[in-house]
């Protein structure tokens, strides 16, 4: 699995969202690399890990990343948050957890109202088989929908998407399956690590209320909402997200 290592200082592991790669975090790298050693992962089937054979399943990916990185704070965005949360619940070397626009369950249920309908991910999977590039572009648009900086964020995501080659279609389907079926809520009550939950006020994929609900279930958790932020708040609101991460990490024991 490809992992870029940039900067010096306490280690952070950064995990990207569906269809993208570690390069998407460039605005955070610019702000955090002077203070931290950043481990930027390309998940299997994505970016420079296009041909990596690690199954895109939580235990396999987390074990591989943990074996290749030092003790660190794990930061997960969107789909990457599922891997980060699983790591925080199972890997002793995870110092703390930061979730950006991510929750333990992405689909709505009778006891989990602040999420999207399961059919959203099912439809993307069906569309992907018929129109690969068009479906990816529609998903990127959903990432930025509602953001105060939607236009510039969408341009950035489009430029980033294929900068390291196109993601593997099989990995995209596996990722949609994780978003559709994963439910890690039971891990929250016993989460021993401190956690930070950063929501976008205007996020249409992961409502801020859902992130605050998740944080309320975890001990040692804090949550904040980025005003005007969409599903990728670290793009248009990079200063606020970087500052929140910096304050969180600086306060760790």
Swiss-Prot record:
Q: Name one GO biological process term.
A: biotin biosynthetic process
Please tell me whether the keyword Hydrolase is annotated for this protein. yes
Catalysed reaction(s) here are: 6-carboxyhexanoyl-[ACP] methyl ester + H2O = 6-carboxyhexanoyl-[ACP] + methanol + H(+)
Which residues are named in the active-site annotation? 78, 203, 231
- On whether Methyltransferase is a keyword of this UniProt record, the answer is no
- Enumerate the residues binding substrate: 18, 78-79, 139-143, 231
- Major localization class: cytoplasm
Disulfide bridge partners, by residue number: none
Q: What is the enzyme's main class?
A: hydrolase
Q: In which pathway does it act?
A: Cofactor biosynthesis; biotin biosynthesis
- Protein family per UniProt: Belongs to the AB hydrolase superfamily. Carboxylesterase BioH family.
Q: What does the record note on quaternary structure?
A: Monomer.
Recorded protein name is: Pimeloyl-[acyl-carrier protein] methyl ester esterase
Give the source species: Xanthomonas campestris pv. campestris (strain B100)
């Amino acid at each position: 699995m490809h992992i870029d290592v940039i900067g010096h200082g306490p280690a952070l592991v950064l995990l990207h969202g569906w269809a993208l790669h570690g390069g998407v975090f460039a605005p955070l790298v610019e702000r955090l690399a002077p203070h931290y050693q950043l481990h930027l992962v390309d998940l299997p089937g994505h970016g420079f890990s296009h041909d990596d054979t690690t199954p895109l399943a939580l235990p396999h990916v987390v074990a591989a990343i943990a074996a290749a990185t030092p003790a660190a704070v794990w930061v997960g965005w969107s789909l990457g948050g599922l891997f980060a949360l699983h790591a925080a619940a199972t890997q002793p070397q995870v110092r703390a957890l930061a979730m950006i626009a991510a929750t333990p369950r992405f689909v709505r249920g009778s006891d989990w109202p602040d999420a999207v309908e399961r059919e959203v991910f099912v439809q993307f999977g069906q569309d992907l088989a018929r129109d690969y590039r068009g479906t990816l572009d529609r998903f990127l648009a959903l990432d930025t929908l509602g953001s105060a900086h939607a236009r510039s964020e969408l341009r950035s995501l489009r430029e980033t998407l294929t900068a390291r080659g196109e993601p593997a279609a099989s990995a995209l389907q596996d990722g949609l399956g994780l978003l559709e079926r994963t439910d890690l809520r039971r891990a929250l009550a016993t989460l021993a690590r401190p956690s930070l939950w950063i929501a976008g006020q205007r996020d249409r994929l992961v409502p801020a209320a859902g992130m605050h609900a998740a944080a309320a279930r975890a001990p040692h958790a804090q949550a904040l909402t980025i005003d005007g932020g969409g599903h990728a708040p670290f793009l248009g609101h990079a200063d606020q997200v970087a500052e929140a991460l910096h304050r969180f990490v600086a306060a760790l024991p």
